[in-house]
Amino acid sequence: MPGFLIAFEGLDQSGKQTQAEALNETLTAAGRACQLLSFPDYQTAIGTEIRRALHGEREYGADVMQLLYVANRYETRKRIEGWLAEGRVILCDRYTASSIAYGEAQELDPGWLADVQRFLPAADLTILLDIPPDVAVQRKQANRDRYERDLDLLTRVRGSYQRQAADPRWLQLRGDRPKADVSADVRAAVASRLGLL
């Protein structure tokens, strides 16, 4: 059985982790081996540096921050490739499109951001859980990092995600609906596009 990589993208509080976990339960119950990932991975040295920057302990330009995010994903590249070779379904809470969305929102070239990630395994399906920026801010009032406090930035990030979602390997869903409704749409897409259910 081939492996698949499914990425969940969207603003913070859009339901990415919730939907990745729900799909993991469904696929596991159907007999598929799965692997849940979340980026950034704060358990690595690069992830620790990202956390410091997000909480204001370090100051980096937008280009350096995106390179840190990309490097954090490259830290996991060999494991991802191994899991895919084993036939696992990898479910990512954020993946390569996040760097493009947040970088483009900060006036970085999206082509450059895609190019530096070209050696990472490509997602077979990217699911955009789209919510308005004001909903994202309302859902997370406490402990927001520097990106989550900037409504204008979140609006630009959302625009980049929506442009990327024109790719046929993407599915855009409204993330402000009941969780069960979103989960049903995710399962239907995984069944029809990847034949997993």
What are the residue ranges of the model-derived segments?
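Walker A (P-loop) phosphate-binding motif
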Residues: 1-23
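Hydrophobic "anchor" residues on beta-strands that sit immediately upstream
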Residues: 5-8, 89, 126
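NTP-dependent small-molecule kinase module
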Residues: 24-26, 134-197
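ATP-dependent small-molecule kinase phosphotransfer cores
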Residues: 32-118
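Hydrophobic residues at beta-strand termini and immediately following loops
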Residues: 37, 129, 173
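Short beta->alpha linker loops
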Residues: 41, 71, 95, 131-132, ...
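A glycine- and Lys/Arg-enriched "phosphate-lid" helix/loop adjacent to the NTP-binding pocket
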Residues: 94, 99-160
